[in-house]
Amino acid sequence: PQALSAMCPTLLALTSARDLGVILDSELSFDKHISKLSQSCFFRLRRLRAIRASLSSSALHTLVHAFICSRLDFCNSTFYGLKASNVDRLQSIFNAAARLLLNVPKFEHISVAIRDALHWLPVKQRIEFKVCLLVRNCLKGSAPEYLRELCVTIGMNEFRPNTRAAERGDLFEPRVRTERFGRRGFSAAGPHMWNSLPTDITQLATTNGTDT
């Protein structure tokens, strides 16, 4: 770590820091956070497996959602753009949780069962869904102002002329120079993903009065 000294005792820069339960590192790789998360979730899965015979199906589902799914979904919009190896690590936790719920052997294929029996989205799609949900909340005015300011329709942006995209209500996508920090930011990722959705879905999502 680099040291910082300016008329005060030398301060060492940290390579990672915890904020709201998420471990952030200087490269935004989330390697350390995912390692801690994986360790914690697999520990809880082992404990649940040990008492599985004493639990009803509904109780087991409740415990898995409380101790596993909720932890994996917490702040998962920050995982957008993760390298594939880390996405796979998160998916392995979901797979293990699904095997516990469905009593599927370790080496048996689980993806179809996750989709058909549990109706769970894969990790990558769960992350993308959370980003789109945040955009939807911004457009409906229920998100914090600092996020709403990042979701501006093309017709409202004075730097862009009226186009067919403006007629569709597409969001303004800022130019970014870097993949790691620019394209993964909500200001770029949110509008890009929202604009890629079919128009009938975006219109339904923003006109529906029920928050989900």
Residue ranges and their predicted role:
Residues 1-212:
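Hydrophobic/basic alpha-helical segments
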